[in-house]
């Protein structure tokens, strides 16, 4: 018996899509603003760089564990229940930032918000499969969803900068996110979601999710996504440090390099739907991964004068890789397994986002310059390209 979903009208379908878009934008506002927040907490709590970096890797680890250990609940409890529970926890956690004044209190809230994100994100990713009638539509929707994530990544740091310039604390970003999240929760509660039918014999448990870690398709896509995430996070965590000593004629470009990277990434994801309608997704992944590798390689060969141009430009080529691989990885499985496989992929995503920058930092400290961390990232970009070349030539999913 095949998995199906009950039909809902076009208006409800559009409402579900926009709710999903806004959810991804909302949590990107907080997760991708951490780079602007860390200097503030270093000053406020007299922290070392290692201690302050916990604001980045601790919630990422929480997202990873939540996705892996709780992702199957999106299949067991249903998408709507999972999404609403996650949004409620995230909203309450966000409001609690307003009453806190200690580093450990804030870090505890980051753990809670990470768990909530992992919970409702797996539900939202599984929901995309429910509302998609084909693999191409799934990939198109996923690119649009990640486009809104890219918009949130631009809005979040801008809000923090505005709050600080206006004399307000960074923590009120979370209050703003909490208000938006509470509104989304109410709208999600009032929205009719497609009801999924599954085989009566299916046993939806954590054991099934852990077993999926051995599936070659889940493992293959997750590994490729992890490699991509390491190369992407390298940009928004360490590129400002790499370009800090730039003394050329394009000082303004070095100053706004990270913003330009985020803009390219967001625009590319919105364009992804059109590009993927014209070309085979495996060809697109091969070409974009090659372009990313070249951006890294030539930045390392020709130094900071080339990196100031090439690393921000890489955002355009990175834009389509994550949503496309995520979509193809999830849609390989039955709809009743989408929550579990989304949790597995999210686990690899968040672990890579947490450990990648740490590995780069360790290598940079060992050799005394941040460029050595980028040599490591270049290696990961090269491996990603080789995987996409193998995918194009051997077509293992067909």
Short names for language-model regions:
Residues 34-35, 216-259, 266:
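Extracytoplasmic gate region of multi-pass secondary transporters
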Residues 144-192:
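Helix-loop-helix hairpin linking two adjacent transmembrane segments in secondary transporters
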Residues 332-369:
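A late C-terminal transmembrane helix in Major Facilitator Superfamily
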């Amino acid at each position: 018996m095949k998995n199906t979903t009950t039909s809902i009208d076009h208006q409800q379908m559009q409402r579900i899509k926009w709710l999903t878009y806004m959810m991804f934008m909302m949590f990107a506002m907080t997760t991708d603003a951490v780079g602007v927040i860390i200097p503030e907490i270093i000053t406020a709590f007299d922290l070392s760089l290692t201690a302050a970096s916990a604001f980045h890797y601790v919630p990422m680890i929480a997202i990873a564990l939540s996705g892996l250990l709780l992702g199957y609940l999106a299949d067991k409890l249903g998408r709507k229940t999972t999404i609403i529970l996650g949004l409620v926890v995230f909203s309450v956690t966000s409001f609690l930032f307003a009453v806190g004044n200690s580093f450990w209190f804030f870090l505890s809230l980051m753990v809670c918000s990470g768990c909530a994100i992992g919970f409702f994100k797996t539900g939202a990713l599984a929901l995309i499969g429910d509302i998609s009638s084909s693999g191409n539509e799934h990939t198109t929707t996923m690119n649009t969803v990640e486009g809104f994530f890219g918009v949130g990544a631009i809005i979040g740091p801008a809000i923090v900068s505005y709050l600080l310039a206006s004399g307000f604390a960074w923590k009120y970003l979370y209050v703003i996110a909490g208000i938006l999240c509470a509104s989304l929760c109410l709208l999600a509660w009032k929205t009719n979601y497609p009801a999924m039918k599954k085989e009566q014999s299916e046993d939806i448990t954590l054991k099934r999710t852990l077993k999926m870690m051995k599936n070659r398709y889940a493992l293959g896509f997750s590994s490729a996504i992890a490699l991509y995430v390491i190369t992407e996070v390298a940009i928004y965590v360490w590129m400002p440090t790499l370009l800090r000593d730039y003394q050329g004629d394009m000082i303004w470009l070095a100053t706004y390099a990270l913003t330009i990277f985020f803009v390219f990434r967001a625009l590319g994801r919105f364009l992804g739907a059109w590009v993927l309608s014209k070309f085979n997704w495996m060809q697109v992944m091969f070409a974009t991964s090659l372009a990313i590798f070249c951006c890294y390689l030539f930045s390392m060969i020709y130094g900071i004068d080339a990196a100031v141009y090439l690393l921000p430009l890489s955002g355009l080529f990175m834009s389509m890789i994550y949503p496309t691989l995520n979509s193809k990885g999830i849609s390989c499985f039955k709809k009743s397994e989408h929550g579990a496989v989304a949790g597995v992929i999210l686990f690899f995503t968040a672990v890579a986002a947490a450990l990648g920058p740490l590995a780069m930092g360790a290598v940079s400290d060992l050799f005394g310059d941040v460029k050595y961390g980028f040599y490591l990232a270049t290696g990961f970009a090269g491996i990603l390209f080789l995987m996409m070349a193998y995918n194009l030539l051997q077509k293992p999913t067909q």
